[in-house]
Amino acid sequence: MSYYIRQSVLTIIWLIVALLLVMSLISYSANDPSWSHINSAVNEVSNLAGTGGAWLADILYAFLGAASWWLIVIACYEAWNVWRHDVEPNGLLRFLGYIFLIIATAGLTGVLSFGWLAQGMIGQIVGNGLSSLLTYWGTLLFLLVFIAITVTFTFDLHWHEILSGQAIRSRLQAEAADDDEANTKLKA
């Protein structure tokens, strides 16, 4: 299979995953039959992704809460990453970063007590555990800094470029240079 076809297929797969997650999470209803409750009185599932989407959304909200929405961002980022030529093959580190980011975000929503749907079980465990060690404000500060650091390394952000307005320009220039190099290799 050619490199271009492989990239296209991977991009489509990641975007389909993102779309299914959006459909599942946005149309979540506690009335749908799912993992945490069975409702035989409902003849029609209201989740846009069907019964599977109702189950998926219920499991994600039960365990991760609002941090489940990071999965959509991650799927879109991975779809974009497929086309980047400057990405180092550090998939395992990026995967660990995703996990830490989701757990820290769940913990943050647990500390902020946005409710059961927002924090999930993991958020409640992490938030309560850290609050008993660091107090409320210490936990809040720790998780915010941890999330910022995790986002920086996981998504390969350079804050100096972002704050100075150079991020988009330098990314576009790097992509153009990579495309020129790839086109030169194809012609040769």
Regions of interest found by a model, annotated:
Residues 1-188:
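Alpha-helical transmembrane segments used as membrane anchors
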